[in-house]
């Protein structure tokens, strides 16, 4: 039997949802896990979500914008006030090891025969969005595998160009 991957993403510290997804993955015979970022942010359980993703996905995780801002003491000017409050709250909840782990995640990475990125491949640290064919087209040139998984949009999307997804 071959490898079967579950691609996790935009968990946003929602332990109840993550638990349900993991239970469903187990019934589907998933053997490996990856995460396209944003493990933390918005919800109440950042610590346990980080620890579970670390346990299951290991190095097959990339940094999301919420992971980035919650792992460091960067200025939050320009953030929506409620979003800034959530970042501050999450920063206080995480221990040093969790902050360091989040802050050291890569922006993109290759796993086996596919790529992971949270935002865009052309400038992943700028947290741009891929919502349409034009934005996807700009990223295909940076894709080094036939398949790339991304998060950030909270919308299930797929784009294809000459056999590259």
Identify what each model region corresponds to:
Residues 107-112, 159-161:
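Short acidic-hydrophobic surface loop/beta-edge motif
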Residues 130-165:
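Conserved beta-sheet core of the metallophosphoesterase superfamily
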Residues 58, 68, 125-128, 159-165:
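Divalent-metal (often Zn2+) His-rich catalytic cores of metallo-beta-lactamase-fold enzymes
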Residues 2-101:
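Core catalytic region of metal-dependent phosphoesterases/phosphodiesterases
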Residues 25-30, 111, 142-144:
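Glycine-rich phosphate-binding loop signature in dinucleotide/nucleotide-binding domains
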Residues 4-12, 113-120, 165:
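Active-site-proximal beta-strand elements of phosphoester/diester hydrolases
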Residues 78-84, 114-144:
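Active-site-proximal segments of metal-dependent phosphoesterases and phosphodiesterases across multiple
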Residues 12, 65-66, 118-120, 152-154:
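Histidine-centered divalent metal-coordination motifs
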């Amino acid at each position: 039997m071959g490898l079967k991957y579950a691609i996790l993403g935009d968990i946003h510290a929602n332990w109840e949802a993550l638990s349900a997804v993991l239970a469903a993955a187990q019934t589907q015979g998933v053997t490996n896990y990856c995460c396209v970022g944003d493990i933390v942010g918005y919800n109440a359980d950042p610590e346990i979500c980080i620890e579970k993703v670390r346990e299951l996905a290991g190095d097959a995780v990339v940094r999301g914008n919420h992971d980035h801002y919650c792992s460091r003491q960067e200025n939050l000017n320009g953030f929506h006030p409620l979003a800034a409050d959530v970042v501050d709250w999450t920063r206080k909840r995480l221990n040093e090891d969790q902050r360091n782990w989040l802050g050291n995640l890569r922006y993109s990475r290759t796993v086996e025969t596919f790529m992971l990125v949270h935002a865009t491949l052309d400038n992943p640290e700028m947290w741009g969005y891929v919502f349409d064919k034009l934005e996807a087209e700009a990223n295909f040139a940076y894709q080094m595998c036939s398949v790339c998984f991304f998060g950030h949009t909270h919308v299930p999307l797929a784009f294809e160009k000459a056999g590259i997804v």
